[in-house]
UniProtKB/Swiss-Prot annotation:
Residues 497-520 have a biased composition (Acidic residues). The gene is RANGAP1. GO terms for molecular function: GTPase activator activity. SMART domains: LRR_RI. This is RAN GTPase-activating protein 1. The WPP domain is required for the nuclear envelope localization. It is found in: Cytoplasm; Nucleus envelope; Nucleus membrane; Cytoplasm, Cytoskeleton, Spindle.
Length: 535
């Protein structure tokens, strides 16, 4: 009898401990609101929420914590409720800390541009899953029939199916007023089936909108993802900017993009960075590029493209006479691709930025590009050719090309093999460049003479901001000389802490010690005139 009574008493206590009363839940909301709005070390770093915003967050946190704890309690029907209370408190504390670290303006950030466009943005704060209840809270301004939003960004949040259903209903009601949509990184961590379902919902909701900007990057789309957005992509006839970066764009996915795009006449920006495109995929992208007469900014970097795909892209780009920015970094074009690009660059006279690092161009490809650019792109501002196995053999042509670009602001030739001779030629080439801001010749087997020549040239320029010659073979004396030149502007010199004074040039192991010989080399090359081509 005593044991039975004790068991009954435990069960009664269990009921009293869980669920908490309404007043207890309201009290927790009040306490969290107070904690969130109290100045702390976190608020000094992330900002302090207003009482109104804190109260909304506190209510949402309590609801989520209660749901989690209640589910825990239901899974342990014989428990006394103690563990559920513990989960309730722990989850509330965790979510409250997330909000404090997130800072204010979490609900949405609204910006009004000069042309009157209104921008709705929920990408701020920590990357997180979003379910229906939070979606209703976050997207409330969009659901207001009086809203005038024309641009939206839903990135950095992962939408579940239920949240997507609500979001889709909202987007469907305002799609006619939207001109820019950013859905980058909006299904992260979701199972493939759910992610594709979410994509389909958003696609259907936005079908028929007249967008000028569409960003679907960072979603690991692949062909399935591209086709999940088929109804949206296929209905866009006025696109000016399309971003498909870090999306698993394979050969088949690239073909799907080509198939689904109904019109490319107005596209000015097209970016495919960091995909698994390969040569066959590059051929499909080339077919898109060929039909983009208005293209101004093309990026296809880190896409595993070899010589065959490089040649296809180069030939397609010949049709883009308005191109200003070209980024093909980190592919395997090789010499053949470089020569094809040279032919293309000769007709792209409006280029202002060229990024061709890590393409395996070697001297032959570099010479071809240099000769082509000598007669093209007179307003070039950025030139990057890092990591292309460039030696002094092709530096003469390259220096002549650089000397002809008086608008050049940024030059990156890092991770090549220019050595002193090539470096001194480059230094002479930029002598008259009054707009030069940044030069990177790190990791180029440069010794004292080359380092001194380049430093002397750039340090006296009023516009100059950063020189990087780290990772070379500069002697201790050379380092001291360079540091002394920059003693009044040390922020303009990347520290030389990775320099190796004992570095060996294995092609010339018998080279004599620096010093007088370095001065002789500098003097000899300094008297050379850089040939800038024949008219």
């Amino acid at each position: 009898m005593d044991h039975s009574a004790k068991t009954t008493q435990n069960r009664v206590l269990s009921v009293k401990m869980w669920p908490p009363s309404k007043s207890t839940r309201l009290m927790l909301v009040e306490r969290m609101t107070k904690n969130i709005t109290t100045p702390s070390i976190f608020s000094r770093k992330y900002g302090l929420l207003s009482v109104e915003e804190a109260e909304q967050d506190a209510k949402r946190i309590e609801d989520l914590a209660f749901a989690t704890a209640n589910k825990h309690f239901q899974n342990e029907p014989d428990g006394d409720g103690t563990s559920a209370v513990h989960v309730y408190a722990k989850e509330s504390s965790k979510l409250m800390l997330d909000v404090i670290k997130r800072g204010p303006q979490e609900e949405s950030e609204v910006e009004v541009s000069k042309d009157g466009d209104v921008f709705f943005d929920i990408s701020g704060g920590s990357r997180a899953f979003i379910e229906e209840e939070e979606a209703r809270d976050l997207l409330r301004p969009l659901a207001d029939p009086r809203n005038s939003y024309t641009k939206i960004r839903f990135s950095n949040r992962s939408f579940g199916s239920e949240a997507a259903k609500f979001a889709a209903s909202v987007l469907s009601s305002i799609k006619d007023q939207l001109t820019e949509v950013d859905l980058s990184d909006f299904v992260a961590g979701r199972p493939e089936a759910e992610a594709l379902e979410v994509m389909n919902m958003f696609s259907s909701a936005l079908e028929g909108s007249k967008l000028r900007y569409l960003n679907l990057s960072d979603n690991a789309l692949g062909e399935k993802g591209i086709r999940a957005f088929a109804s949206l992509i296929n209905s866009q006839h006025d696109l000016e900017e399309l971003y498909l970066m870090n999306d698993g764009i394979s050969e088949d996915a690239a073909r799907a993009v080509r198939e689904l795009l109904p019109s490319t006449d107005k596209i000015r920006v097209l970016q495919f960075h960091n995909n698994m495109t390969g040569d066959e995929g590059a051929t499909a992208i080339a077919e898109i590029v060929r039909e983009c007469p208005s293209l101004e900014d093309f990026r296809c970097s880190s896409t595993r493209i070899g010589s065959e795909g490089g040649v296809a892209l180069a030939e397609a780009l010949e049709h883009c006479s308005h191109l200003k920015k070209l980024d093909l970094r980190d592919n395997m074009f090789g010499v053949e691709g470089g020569i094809a690009l040279a032919k293309t660059l000769s007709v792209l006279t409006h280029l202002t930025e060229i990024y061709m690092s890590y393409l395996n161009l070697e001297d032959e490809g570099t010479e071809a590009l240099s000769e082509a650019l000598l007669k093209s792109a007179p307003s070039l501002e950025v030139l990057e050719l890092a990591g292309n196995d460039i030696t002094v053999k092709s530096t003469g042509n390259l220096a002549a090309c650089i000397a002809s670009k008086q608008s050049l602001a940024k030059l990156n030739l890092s991770e090549n093999e220019l050595k002193d001779e090539g470096t001194i030629l480059i230094a002479k080439a930029v002598e008259g460049h009054d707009q030069l801001v940044e030069v990177d010749l790190s990791t180029n087997m440069i010794r004292r003479a080359g380092a001194r020549a380049l430093a002397q040239t750039v340090v006296k320029k009023n516009t100059f901001k950063l020189l990087n010659i780290n990772g070379n073979f500069i002697s201790e004396e050379g380092i001291d000389e360079v540091n002394d030149m920059f003693k009044d502007c040390l922020d303009k010199l990347v520290p030389l802490d990775d320099n190796d004074p004992e570095g060996e040039d294995f092609e010339d192991e018998d080279e004599e010690e620096e010093g007088e010989d370095g001065n002789e080399l500098e003097s000899k090359l300094g008297s050379l005139k850089i040939k800038q081509g024949e008219e």
